[in-house]
C-alpha cells in the first residue's frame, strides 16, 4: 500500500490522475480512508466511487474526476463504467489483481488511452499462484517480490486445531482480547450461502460478540 501511495504521489507531481481499483467495497473503502489521510496534508485530492455512491453524490464525484479536481480516485468495478471520464489518467493501480478479469483491467486502462495516453499499471497481489504466474504470463511487466519481514516483526507460529476444540480456541481469543491484544478471525464467506457449507464472517461475528 505504501508503494502504491508513493507511485500515486509521483503521478500527481506530473499532473496525472491515478485510479486505484479493489475487488470489494470494504477493501476499497479502507484504501480511500488511508489514502485520504496520507494525501490530504499535501493537498492531493481524492475521490471515491462504488455501487454505494449514488445520486447527487455520484454525479458530484464524476464531475470532479472529469474536471481533474480529483487526482487520486479509489473504487471498485465502478471505476470502469461508461459514465466515468478521467481528465488525464496516467496511473492504474489494481489491488488483488487476480480478482479481476483481463477485460476488466483493460477497460480501466482504456480510460486513459482514449485521451491519447497509455497509463502505467501497478498490479498487486499477496497470493502465491498469481505472483508466480506473473513471471511467465506477464512477460512485459517488471515483477517485484517483497521477501523480507519488516524490521522488528516477530515470527508467526502456525498451529492446526480440529473443530472439536473450537471452544478452546474461543477461550484463547477471549484471553488475548482481555489483555488488550488484537485477534483476526478469518472466514471463507462474508454472508451465509445456501449452496456452500462454509463459515460466514457475519454469523461468526454475532456468535463471538455474545460470549
Enumerate the predicted regions with their spans.
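Inter-lobe coupling/hinge segments of SF2-like helicase ATPases
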Residues: 1-211
Amino acid at each position: 500500500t505504501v508503494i502504491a501511495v508513493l507511485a500515486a504521489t509521483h503521478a500527481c507531481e506530473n499532473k496525472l490522475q491515478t485510479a486505484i481499483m479493489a475487488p470489494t467495497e470494504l477493501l476499497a473503502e479502507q484504501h480511500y480512508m488511508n489514502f485520504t489521510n496520507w494525501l490530504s496534508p499535501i493537498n492531493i485530492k481524492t475521490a471515491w466511487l462504488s455501487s454505494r455512491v449514488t445520486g447527487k453524490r455520484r454525479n458530484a464525484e464524476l464531475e470532479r474526476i472529469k474536471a481533474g479536481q480529483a487526482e487520486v480516485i479509489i473504487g471498485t468495478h465502478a471505476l470502469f463504467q461508461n459514465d466515468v471520464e478521467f481528465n488525464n489518467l496516467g496511473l492504474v493501480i489494481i489491488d488483488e489483481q487476480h480478482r479481476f478479469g483481463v477485460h476488466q483491467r483493460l477497460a480501466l486502462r482504456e480510460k486513459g488511452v482514449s485521451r491519447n495516453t497509455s497509463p502505467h499499471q501497478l498490479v498487486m497481489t499477496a497470493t502465491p499462484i498469481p505472483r508466480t504466474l506473473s513471471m511467465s504470463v506477464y512477460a512485459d511487466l517488471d515483477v517485484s517480490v517483497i521477501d523480507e519481514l519488516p524490521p522488528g516483526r516477530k515470527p508467526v507460529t502456525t498451529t492446526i486445531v480440529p473443530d472439536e476444540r473450537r471452544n478452546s480456541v474461543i477461550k484463547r481469543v477471549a484471553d488475548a482480547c482481555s489483555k488488550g491484544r488484537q485477534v483476526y478471525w478469518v472466514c471463507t464467506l462474508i454472508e451465509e450461502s445456501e449452496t456452500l457449507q462454509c463459515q460466514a464472517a457475519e454469523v461468526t461475528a454475532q456468535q463471538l460478540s455474545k460470549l
